[in-house]
A protein has these predicted regions:
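Accessory "access/gating" subregions that flank catalytic or transport cores
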Residues: 26, 143-152, 163-171, 180-185, ...
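Catalytic phosphate/nucleotide-handling subdomain of diverse soluble enzymes
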Residues: 44, 48, 55, 59-68, ...
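Active-site-surrounding "flap" and adjacent substrate/cofactor-binding loops of secreted or lumenal enzymes
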Residues: 50-83, 89-93, 108-125
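Surface-exposed or secretory-pathway low-complexity segments enriched in glycine-proline
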Residues: 418-440, 467-469
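Extracellular/luminal low-complexity segments enriched in Ser/Thr/Pro
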Residues: 441-449
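A short beta-strand micro-motif common to beta-rich folds, especially ectodomain repeats
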Residues: 450-462
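C-terminal edge beta-strand
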Residues: 463-474
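Aromatic, loop-rich ligand-recognition surfaces of beta-strand-rich domains
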Residues: 521-590, 607-657
Length: 657
């Protein structure tokens, strides 16, 4: 956990920002027009690009199809008599409401509450995985951590975080810091860099109208050796080498970031891949809104996201007044962009809105951000501090409990990218023998099994917080000494899996059930699917162990794996042991830490969860868990006939005295 939660941009934000000169000035009218351009531009791009989402992968769309037009979405615009919500704009609307409710710098805990209340369906990939972890009790950035969110490398944060930057006009360092902070709700490592770069460009675009210069300014805020930064520089070089051949440039970038991508992160939704398609669209669009929009669709992959992001960015650069009226008012009789209507079709408790009202509210928040960070308003002028920096709110971030076992080296960080720079201390309780605590990190090798209550404090921003934690050190894992594995499915049916709509790199999947007691809980080859046939029939899976000699058991550690859209989780769980006559008996009541999911709804299921299941001690030659697999519908023509399997990485067995 320690490695995944390290902020890759921290050093850059502290040391590398180039001098930006004196305070920036912009009129209130121009500021509001550019904020309007961000909202309206994103709506144009999202609705325009949606029909082409995931359509062009191996090859881009032909330029002969330009301009694409709204195609089938023109009818939807007419039906709703305005713009309609989608994930490229609706999460930002939620963030607008959260800033109004909690202030311009909400905490991760505030963000979690907002997500859980408003987002109940229509999320995918990293966003869905983050939501599931929130319902398990975690807060960001653990919800985006590499070890817990198997979609950490996908595009999700780029398309939902632009608002942090267009409420920070001309404050690029602040915008980058806040965008990076928010990106970690769903993502980690190099996958947050596109969000940070676009955050820098959105903020800089209030005062920069040259596309190439804008990209180069944004690059100042990424580490020199960052993977995405290298890709952006390659795009700039390709544009110089092939100024009239965007297809060639797209081919080269797609080969490196898709065809030849690491199999574990090779998807059409990869963050760097899609973020670079947006950069190419901007370069070859040369600042022309319509051409940039068409190119962002033609580049392919998850193209509606690029279309929304770059269209909003050009909207900031040139202002809403410069956006083509045939795109903002495509329905006869409309006299305002999208008829001044934003209709919610995606989120719970998110009211329909006047677009102008959304713009006004965002403008007010932008002024609040400016004034809170060394800027001010004088008459009709907004005076901005371009060197403002974002300091994350002080808070404990909540993730899984430390995974501690006698004799197994531990390295767990309670600290994360948002609070690792603050002062940590152990203020109460005694650590397990063999462990030490320093600056938020627990290290060492536990020597004695048991339960240990400790209190940690966190100091910064002029205040101190304290929080209690319960550490459980498990004894040696009896599963490692099992003589047999009990299960109803021993081998993954790879042919069935390959025919389904899967969203992970193929190295993730183990071929046999033998991995459940190999000690590996994450990463390539760690996840076993009990997928035996192309079936959607209800079934109960079981996993367990047998020993030649009886063992005492009172705890099972169930480690689930990554989940597909069409299955992998369970609706109920039971635990059984072998009695002296060789019959399976229920262990009786058991407790689970954390609690098992309270619903089997697909959107609320956590990936890579660890459940400690405790029950009265039994002495037995066999133990197993029975899992009632979930039947989940899916839209894909083959996948819709496949479900009812369990995703598992490890099953531990213990006797904790």
């Amino acid at each position: 956990m320690k490695k995944a939660l390290t902020g890759c941009l921290a050093a850059v934000l502290l040391a590398s920002a180039s001098p930006m000169g004196a305070a920036e000035k912009i009129s209130k009218e121009e500021l509001k027009d550019k904020i309007a351009g961000a909202w309206i531009g994103q709506m144009v791009g999202n609705i325009y690009g949606l029909p082409f989402e995931n359509k062009f992968v191996d090859e881009p769309a032909s330029e002969s199809r330009f301009p694409f037009g709204y195609t089938k979405n023109l009818d939807k615009l007419a039906k709703f008599d305005g713009a309609f919500s989608d994930d490229d704009t609706d999460v930002e609307y939620i963030y607008l409401m959260l800033m109004e409710k909690y202030g311009i710098e909400p905490t991760y805990a505030n963000m979690r509450d907002g997500w859980m209340h408003h987002i109940r369906d229509r999320v995918w990939l990293a966003n869905r995985a983050a939501l599931g972890l929130m319902h398990l009790g975690y807060t960001p950035p653990f919800t985006g951590a590499q070890e817990l969110n198997p979609h950490w490398y996908q595009i999700d944060p780029q398309l939902i975080n632009e608002i942090w930057a267009y409420t920070a006009p001309g404050m690029p360092e602040y915008a980058v810091g806040k965008s990076d902070w928010a990106a970690r709700i769903t993502s980690d490592s190099w996958a947050v860099a596109p969000t940070a770069l676009y955050g820098a460009m959105y903020s800089e675009a209030f005062f920069e109208k040259d596309v190439r210069k804008l990209i180069e300014k944004g690059l100042r805020y990424l580490p020199e050796d960052d993977r995405y930064a290298k890709g952006v520089r390659k795009c700039l070089d390709l544009y110089k080498q092939y100024p009239d051949d965007w297809v060639k440039s797209r081919q080269i970038i797609a080969k490196e970031f898709y065809t030849d991508e690491d199999p574990m992160t090779k998807t059409i939704w990869n963050a760097d891949l899609n973020g670079l398609m947006g950069i190419l669209s901007m370069l070859y669009g040369k600042g022309d809104f319509q051409r940039t929009l068409d190119l962002s669709c033609a580049m392919g992959f998850d193209c509606d996201n690029q279309a929304a992001t770059v269209s909003g960015l050009l909207g900031v650069m040139y202002g809403a007044k410069a956006l083509p009226k045939d795109l903002t008012m495509p329905i006869e009789g409309w006299t305002l962009p999208f008829n001044d209507r934003y209709i919610n079709v995606t989120r719970f408790d998110m009211p329909d809105a006047s677009i102008q009202d959304m713009i006004n509210r965002t403008y007010d928040l932008a002024l609040d951000v400016v004034k809170a960070n060394g800027g001010k308003v004088q008459g009709n002028k907004v005076i901005i501090n371009p060197k403002a920096k974002f300091n994350p709110p002080l808070e404990f971030c909540i993730g899984p409990n430390p995974d501690l076992t006698v004799g197994v080296p531990a390295d767990y960080s309670f600290a994360c990218a948002a609070n690792k720079s603050y002062k940590w201390a152990l203020t109460a309780g005694t650590l397990p023998a063999g462990l030490s605590f320093d600056n938020g990190t627990l290290t060492g090798t536990p020597e004695k099994a048991g339960r240990y209550d400790i209190t940690l404090s966190l100091t910064g921003n002029g205040k101190t917080l304290a929080k209690d934690f319960n550490l459980v050190v498990k004894p040696q894992n009896l599963a490692m000494k099992a003589d047999t594995i009990y299960t109803n499915v021993r081998v993954l049916n790879e042919a069935v899996l390959d025919s389904c709509w899967i969203t992970f790199g193929k190295p993730m999947y183990a071929k046999t059930v033998d991995v459940i007691n190999d000690g590996v809980k994450k990463g390539a080859g760690s996840v076993f699917y009990s997928l035996a046939s192309a079936s959607k029939n209800p079934k109960i899976d079981y996993f367990g162990y047998g020993w030649e000699k009886p063992v005492a058991v009172n705890m099972i550690e169930l480690n689930t794996g990554c989940l597909e859209e069409f299955g992998g989780w369970f609706t109920s769980l039971n635990i059984q042991y072998l009695d002296e006559e060789g019959r399976w008996r229920d262990v009786g009541k058991y407790t689970s830490t954390p609690a098992l999911p309270s619903t089997d709804i697909v959107f609320f299921q956590p990936h890579f969860a660890q459940f400690l299941l405790e029950f009265p001690e039994v002495t037995t030659r066999g133990i197993r868990v029975l899992l009632d697999t979930k039947t989940q519908d899916h839209w894909h023509k083959y996948t819709k006939n496949v479900s009812n399997f369990t995703s598992i990485t490890e099953l531990g067995v213990y006797d904790l005295k």
